[in-house]
Amino acid sequence: LMAADTWIDSYYLTSSGAWDPSVAYDNIYTWPCPGYTRVSSDYGPRPRPTAGASSYHRGIDISAPEGATVTSIHRGTVQSYGYNGTMGNYVKISHGNGVASVYMHMSRIANIHTGMSVSAGTTIGYVGSTGVATGAHLHLGILLNGNYVSPWNYISRP
């Protein structure tokens, strides 16, 4: 049995492992860390967890073990990726209509390139603790017209 409903490649599978063809694949946002649903730090004000971290968290942190799969939450185009001292290994995907998603602190980035088209559920990297991080997790940020907004406006916990 699967831990939660999730995307695998372009198929939506229920927690029982059954494919659900009724889910409109191109029109929904999906959970970025299949099988892991614990949010260790939510969007919004928070105490600084470590030096260099913000007291206003501009995303959500999903607890998962080092190496767990990170997937795109929606179809789009890889806008940028690489390493940043704060974000660690990161990928930024443009989804159109001013929406972009950013995935941070990954142990490594999957075989992607700038301009590459991705679908919801495409593997883009693997959970890690690079950059300013206190342990293995995925930080997911959502930008609307260049400003961070709550990821809960787009995704829901499976």
Protein language model annotation of sequence segments:
Residues 7-89, 120:
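Surface-exposed, glycine-biased beta-strand/turn segments
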Residues 76-79, 114-131:
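Active-site-proximal beta-strands of protease catalytic cores
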Residues 6, 84-86, 124-132:
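Short, charged beta-turn/beta-strand-edge "cap" motif at the junction between a beta-strand
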Residues 12-14, 107-108, 143-158:
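Short peripheral tails and domain-boundary helices/loops at the edges of structured domains
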Residues 42, 81-82, 106-109, 127-130, ...:
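Residue-level recognition of beta-strand microenvironments
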Residues 1-2, 93:
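SH3/SH3-like beta-barrel fold
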Residues 64, 109-112:
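Short alpha-helix capping/helix-loop boundary micro-motifs
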Residues 55-58, 72-108, 136-144:
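Zn2+-dependent peptidoglycan hydrolase active-site motif and core
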